[in-house]
Curated annotation (Swiss-Prot):
Species this protein is from: Acorus calamus (Sweet flag)
PROSITE patterns attached to this UniProt entry: CLP_PROTEASE_HIS, CLP_PROTEASE_SER
Catalysed transformations (reactions): Hydrolysis of proteins to small peptides in the presence of ATP and magnesium. alpha-casein is the usual test substrate. In the absence of ATP, only oligopeptides shorter than five residues are hydrolyzed (such as succinyl-Leu-Tyr-|-NHMec, and Leu-Tyr-Leu-|-Tyr-Trp, in which cleavage of the -Tyr-|-Leu- and -Tyr-|-Trp bonds also occurs)
List of catalytic residues: 101, 126
Lineage of producing organism: Eukaryota, Viridiplantae, Streptophyta, Embryophyta, Tracheophyta
Pfam families the UniProt entry points to: CLP_protease
GO annotation, cellular component aspect: chloroplast stroma; endopeptidase Clp complex
Enzyme category, top tier: hydrolase
Similarity field: Belongs to the peptidase S14 family.
Subcellular location: Plastid, Chloroplast stroma
Identification of the protein by name: ATP-dependent Clp protease proteolytic subunit
Coiled coil: none
Length: 202
């Protein structure tokens, strides 16, 4: 039997009694955000909305975005990436489990020097798939010219944020390239590999 979303006690400032709120609501108040599924328009919009709202509330507190995602849609991913660059607080990105495809794109989009992978995390990069719309097969056809533009956009971001030469990134994106946490660090996708001594990160 599913247990639903766990609830935890939380006392709002000025309140005497704690109220039970769902755990994600509580974590969001601490600027802890989660991408733990395929990236689609819904989850992208939720994360964008949270970042914008919480930035209005307090522009000085950093975000911590935990990523365990097989990837997803390119356009929602680019929208989330752009929002991460737009909001005033720094966005720490933390890979736990897998950051593949657009998941790795979001990972590399964290504030430089504040991107981390857990020791046993995996990262995968590749070129964008041939369809980026959420639609029935055949309803939309991605023209080769548009796909090329998207690939150039993603490649340019990886080059800028990893410090790797264009030819290296382009070659890596020709196929699925899986990286360990330390390999992702060597590639410039993350800056740190976490260990047991980093429990006070957040």
């Amino acid at each position: 039997m599913p247990i639903g979303v766990p609830k935890v006690p939380f006392r709002s400032p000025g309140e005497e009694d704690a109220a039970w709120v769902d755990i994600y609501n509580r974590l969001h108040r601490e600027r802890l955000l989660f991408l733990g599924q395929e990236l689609d328009s819904e989850i992208s919009n939720q994360l964008v909305g949270l970042m914008v709202y919480l930035s209005i509330e307090d522009k000085t507190r950093d975000f911590f975005l935990f990523i365990n995602s097989p990837g997803g849609w390119v356009i929602p991913g680019i929208g989330l990436y752009d929002t991460m660059q737009f909001v005033p607080p720094d966005v720490h990105t933390i890979c736990m489990g897998l950051a593949a495809s657009m998941g790795s794109f979001i990972l590399v989009g964290g504030e430089i020097t504040k991107r981390l992978a857990f020791p046993h995390a995996r990262v995968m990069i590749h070129q964008p798939a041939s369809s980026f719309y959420e639609a029935q097969a055949g309803e939309f056809v991605l023209e080769a010219e548009e796909l090329l533009k998207l690939r150039e956009t993603l490649t340019r971001v990886y080059v800028q944020r990893t410090g790797k030469p264009l030819w290296v990134v382009s070659e890596d994106m020709e196929r699925d390239v899986f990286l360990s946490a330390t390999e992702a660090q060597a590639h410039g996708i993350v800056d740190l590999v976490g260990d047991e001594n980093m429990g006070d990160l957040v």
